[in-house]
Amino acid sequence: MKRTALIGQLSTTHLDQAVTLQGWVNRRRDLGGLIFLELRDRSGLVQVQVEPDSPAFAQADQLRAEYVAEVEGIYRARPENQRKGGAADYEVIASRVKVLNTAKTPPFELDKGESVAEDIRLKYRYLDLRRPEMQRHLLLRSRAMAAVTAFLDSSGFVQVETPMLTKSTPEGARDFLVPSRLNPGEFYALPQSPQLFKQLLMIAGYDRYYQFARCFRDEDLRADRQPDFTQLDMEMSFVEQDDVLELQEGLMAHVFKATLDVDLPRPFPRLSYFDAMDRYGSDKPDLRFESALVDVTDLFQGGEFKAFAAAQSVKVLAAAELTRKQIDELERVAKQNGAGGLAWLKRDGDSFTGGISKFVGSVAPQLIKRSGVQDGGTLLFAAGDWKKAVTALGAVRLAVRDLFDLTSSGPRFHVSWVTDFPQLEFDEDSGTWTYMHHPFTAPHPDDAELFGTLRQGEIRAQAYDLVLNGFEVGGGSVRIHDPAVQTKMFEAIGFTEAQAREKFGFFMDALEYGTPPHGGIAWGFDRLVMVMSGASSIREVIAFPKNNRGADLMAEAPSLVDDAQLAELGVGVLSPS
């Protein structure tokens, strides 16, 4: 039962030779006494022709869709008048067909998988994964992993696995908890990231580390989130921020070239967090298209339009001509993202009509010049608190992108860095400061003295995000290696010494034993492959994902467990109220 090759490996070297192929029956047709089969494996499709007088005919007549079959025959070029170019110009004339296994009728047609409800696809994931599109996604993922491994191995990195059962520590999301049978009433947590362990490896002297780490976060799900996911996790000793960014650019460029034959221009552009928010309304801006937010606060200060005159910030976005229905839809987007509304104007020569046009007569020339709006185009405004205004108009910017397909004429991929994030952010609900990334991020050396002062909100973090086509695909930082600075960071976020030691005592002890300067990054590997493949969701690039309710419909998880198992763990279950 030895096959000659995978179907996709057949080439002109096999022409007019006997080949043995194995795979699934993609389609079967009877035509004028002939049987035509499409045989499929992970690498491609080939047409098989079975003639009425062939000894293979009786077996071929039994085949149905998704049967597993072995075909032996002559690989030949199809007649010239049937050729269309590519692999379809060749076929196999069968001399022997063997049914290796039968199959039930699938619950959906595999070649129409995109139109099938996602829950059906996930319930029968083993069938969904037979579809060529899904196989392309997972093969791309495999090639990307291989490219990463080759690059990092050649760059002196050591691959180390870190624990899957660890201590529950505050990292932003809820932990998945695992009860300990041997220690009743105590729990492990599944890791949200290997953050502390990779820093401990730097303290241990391993210099450069990486792993494809499985991570777990019990949070609300959306199109690009899963409760269990894969990070490409990396850490380097004796580095500054530029060293990490330079190596990451080389790695990203290598992965794209090795998997997609795409050359990424380097160096990647860098934006500060403030500039990204101020110009694009996002800390992960999609830079494949030019459109940017423009500040026009000064043009309306003291003016008669009260909503703008008193606003901390007035931002404008220029767009092409929009219908009233489209403007209403964009206003809905703005309101969903915190704006009170969306003011607008239409340019008509040297003036404006519609919307708030009666309030802008005297500043029309300056608005036209500053915004760059074309004649007939539309201006969209958001006003109020700076962050709310830019965030709302940033969401509108992306909606306009989708409305006019603004990325179609730009580069297929655009990679950039966002740097200089705030170290801390103030939580209005609790009235306390919290970390923006995690509590081990090093402050900018010029700002560290601001800890504990009224200006600690101005501290810049040595943190950086890697952004691809408007998706954050990586995030990292230079880490705190000085125990005194780490203590100040814990104090800034309201941890008492006892609280800090309860959560991170083992790590605080380790910092006292000669910690080198170090920094690192983690890529959201599922999200990266999603963008590279053009998939609409990370569920399309994970073999066995959960749905958007966190359920595995195929394995029927999560599920109830019996009382005996719970008793053995010392765990009781409260009925939901």
UniProtKB/Swiss-Prot annotation:
Aspartate as annotated region, ranges? 195-198
List ligand-binding residues for ATP.
217-219, 226, 472, 524-527
What EC class does the entry list? ligase
The residues listed in the UniProt record as binding L-aspartate, with positions renumbered to this chain, are 171, 217, 437, 479
Protein localization:
Cytoplasm
Which EC numbers does the record give? Answer: 6.1.1.12
One GO CC annotation, please? Answer: cytoplasm
- The answer on whether this UniProt entry bears the keyword ATP-binding reads yes
Report TM segments.
none
User: A Pfam family in this protein?
Assistant: tRNA_anti-codon
Q: Name one GO biological process term.
A: aspartyl-tRNA aminoacylation
- Entry keywords, A to Z: Aminoacyl-tRNA synthetase, ATP-binding, Cytoplasm, Ligase, Nucleotide-binding, Protein biosynthesis
Keyword Membrane part of the UniProt annotation: no
* Reaction(s) catalysed (UniProt annotation): tRNA(Asp) + L-aspartate + ATP = L-aspartyl-tRNA(Asp) + AMP + diphosphate
Major localization class: cytoplasm
Q: Tell me the GO molecular function terms.
A: aspartate-tRNA ligase activity; ATP binding; nucleic acid binding
Which PANTHER family would you find in this protein's record?
A: ASPARTATE--TRNA LIGASE, MITOCHONDRIAL (PTHR22594:SF5), ASPARTYL/LYSYL-TRNA SYNTHETASE (PTHR22594)
Q: Can you tell me which family this protein belongs to?
A: Belongs to the class-II aminoacyl-tRNA synthetase family. Type 1 subfamily.
Subunit architecture = Homodimer.
Role summary: Catalyzes the attachment of L-aspartate to tRNA(Asp) in a two-step reaction: L-aspartate is first activated by ATP to form Asp-AMP and then transferred to the acceptor end of tRNA(Asp).
Identification of the protein by name: Aspartate--tRNA ligase
- The scientific name of the source species is Deinococcus deserti (strain DSM 17065 / CIP 109153 / LMG 22923 / VCD115)
